[in-house]
């Protein structure tokens, strides 16, 4: 700064401080002004003042101090520009950080004291920008000890003056000009050495003074004769210099190397020369420049370094627990109230519908009775006698038919609920809807009302239930009247506009052969026949006969097999997958959601698989009809249950399993042993429901095992298979005994025919009369009976053809090794082909020929969302356990691991990453590992996989947001780091999102036990790799690919940003050692989210590839 600039600034300061009148009043004259300007000029240019008394003048010293401070600020600003590039990784805002460290404008007393002490030569003793740069550049060299500097022009092996010792400094020659902003050259500074001023530090190896940063305490040292140390610092007096005394501070570095310079914990340092104990009700961390008030509900004694925030942690967890309890209880209460109201409406509708049909039956009976009496009286008695009989009828309360009709109609209209319900199935009945608002009545006669459709009339829940149960009761009445009704009669009866037509499908197959690709074994061979709509076809045979294989081949689910022959649909060669929306497949295992009720399971499939344009009233009718026909009314509101939690009985569960496919109104229904494990009554109830479906035109094919005679006679057709997948019989059930009798196979008395035929095919029954036909010849007999071509090997020697084994060769070691290698290679190839076929099958696209438009993906996402939300609500105890474990983990880690200022809390964050990753991964595995079978079944039926995946991920967002809050409620308030709660919460949310995606992938690609093992192993291994020194390129690459590295960096950066002032070197040193960049906090967050999103994509692709349809 030149003289003219100094003059202008001085005049402005004088103008601002006092006005002209005060100047004259205090007797200031021209001589004082000239003296002040001269002093400022010399001090600012690094000159000394000969007369010390001039600096004791109160009017001169503040002005000179301001000028020195401006020069010092300019030099530190120049140093900031020089070091800003190298320190970019640890300084986010250079100006702000430098201002927090060297902005002494609030109190310049230490400068004034130093001006007095140095007799005005302070400008010649302060380090230039080049010397400061020389000192600070040493910290970027990892091998350099901050206590020692390299030799330089002033301190070297040939020149080591007293100012080179720690805590001392020297001045330049009095005639030499010093430019503090010079960042290139060292001035020769070896004269007039003296102890360092308070508020400055003089490093060993430099002869100049550097101002201590804010947050430091740099008093003059005093000699401790016991330890020979210059306290509070750690340097000793040099040997051989008896006149040398303790000086000032000697170093400013990281907390490990220069902890004595930092303002001690429990105190704060408003200036670098003043330390004040912390008052009661306040706390002061190490390196503080001011005391901070403690929060309410916390107690802070004097000299407190940190406040106890355990109470806030308890309050947070109490608030979170309260909110969760409110959410769960309110949701459960809402669901319970809704279900209770629906149950009341349903029960009322059932009572009214049954009462109405009882009245209708009574009316019909009365009509027939009156008609019979009239006819009898007319034939036997006179008119007078007939009049007497009429009086008798009146006495009995029965009038003529018109009076009865009027009475019944009036009783029907007397109920407000029944008067407003839309009754579309009544025949030749008029219902008047008389409301309180005086609307005109509507006459409904099984057709649309003029100006209004049924969909518009059926609005309320009561009306919908009444509509459904009136239809159900009418169907029951019709079934009772037409017990022997045939399929053609049903078709004729279904011509009214109320009945929806189902797509009729006939399946026919010719020379159907199924061969395993792995070993070439034929599981089906030359199977020919057909399955017609409106009929129930039973597939029977001994074990290994290929019953399930036939069902899978017809349903298009045979994977890993080579299929030959023809499968025709309605006489056309089309893919069965084109009709998957109207084909139901009931697996042998009861794949039903155990944490849903019976009604909820059925309703979910109805919503997702019934036509999208079907009205709600018709959907209610479908579901209620299935519940009623399967006898599930008593348990409709009961949870199905799981292995761990008991629910409904096994027979009821089996019926629910069948109802999931019946509720979508299929055209073809395949069932794999639906009666296994059921008693006779349950089996009959199930077959009665299937019989009703068949009467509506459904083509039903089912595998059964040893049915009773009653169930056997319920079937329309029978497919009997022998071992090896050969057909023994395919035709009507009523003609099976006739056919086998023609072969000389007669069923003994009191023996169930299907059991006897199975024993014959198993070879258990040896004697079969005088026919001389062996059980192995029965398939060939059936082919000859139907006129099919018999394969050559069967014609020659059927049994030998089935039992011939390939030559295994000799037992020589060479052949054995070649055989083993050949078998191993064959197994590898077969496994590869099987996986390829599964992937190809999963991604098979077929033209939709079902003519059914199911709900869109977005609508199915909504249904999945509601179902999964209910399941999570019913897993409240399990969720509470997860939260409790996280709570305990946060409390334990927060209590055992204290936040360290030296490492910015890195050890605690390392254990946090391991604990939270491990616990959240294991919990997230349940989202996909527990219901793989359910997903495979739903996906095979045509439900959207993306809707299922997105719904589960959406519901898990609740845990992703809540679990970090639960953990931090203990960990954060126990450790009380300098970073904010919000910063820690954001990082932890992103971490949980990341590990949840990884858990999805593990759950889908691995078995549950293996997935749990990897969930424990991955966080530990990846965290250890991420915290290892990056000495090799491989370790660095692996660390960059592991999510713990980015989570830990985000945690440390968030905490390091709150350390400034005296902590600047510590912050830069720690970040440089770890390889972190303070500007990459957002990048770390984005990478965690990207990993979570990528792993979710991988999990979704795996879900599509690995699904078993």
Swiss-Prot record:
Region (Disordered): 378-399, 411-439
Keywords tagged on the record: ATP-binding, Membrane, Nucleotide-binding, Transmembrane, Transmembrane helix, Transport
Membrane-traversing stretches: 877-897, 904-924, 954-974, 986-1006, 1007-1027, 1085-1105
Localisation per UniProt entry: Membrane
Membrane topology recorded in Swiss-Prot or TrEMBL: Multi-pass membrane protein
Domain (ABC transmembrane type-2) ranges: 859-1059
Name used for this protein in its record: ABC transporter G family member 24
Record's keyword annotation contains ATP-binding: yes
Domain ABC transporter: 507-749
Biased composition (Low complexity): 411-425
Organism: Arabidopsis thaliana (Mouse-ear cress)
Cellular-component GO terms for this entry: membrane
Pfam families the UniProt entry points to: ABC2_membrane_7, ABC_tran
Record family assignment: Belongs to the ABC transporter superfamily. ABCG family. Eye pigment precursor importer (TC 3.A.1.204) subfamily.
SUPFAM superfamilies with a match to the protein in the record: P-loop containing nucleoside triphosphate hydrolases
Record-level Gene Ontology MF annotations: ABC-type transporter activity; ATP binding; ATP hydrolysis activity
Residues binding ATP: 541-548
